[in-house]
């Protein structure tokens, strides 16, 4: 096991062991700093040795009731690089098909594993079931509610790309802000810092009022329908897809699907050191001709997801506790 990883995990300023990760509101600047330090150590360790045996003998239950590529695979890869193993549970193989409650499913699974990652289509379902469990539970997305581990990797990416600077940035969140759980978590996580937020979306996909009411207590934000209104001032452009699966009918989806179309020409007025982020998958909102632009950070963002999730698994299972 990397000595630097062990040192960072054992010397955090905040306690982590047996922690559930359910919401952005569990993270202040101190806890974020701890996470980033451990994540940096994980990155360095993977670069030099590929992995370690920190979580040898530990089992991750990966429970996904909605489709996932990046979140599911990055958690599995994270666990395996730390020497642990994973059990993948998908709806087609779950006893939920027989009418079993989510509570019972997870209580049974934690008899076999040491930590559980859960994605579920119902808003509030993941925090709601946590009270029945004795072992750590990580929220991998609860409907249109939150996606805290995505917000954490997004924050880490912003900090890393901006050489440690977050205060003073202007961050544009663009796309489906109504249904995008990634931006719901990220906007509020950024309340820990002195940033300016710009919300850009069609009228029908604006950021929910309850989130705006919360954000305005700490941050300056403005709302726009055109990216050109704010692109010149942006340090970070965070793009999200329009989420077809959240629409009740296809006609409403098609009305807004192609609202934003980001290509090389779009970026001609943007700062040279701006970064472009996207939680992926993309469905046409960022052209592939942008991929070669050094400002395109979304694949670096995906790689960061593995390192951040390595740190979260390690901290929740091996981090500082009460002893």
Tell where the protein language model's regions lie, with residue ranges:
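Structural/interface elements that position substrates and couple domains in central-metabolism enzymes
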Residues: 12-323
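Short hydrophobic alpha-helical segments enriched in small aliphatic residues
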Residues: 3-7
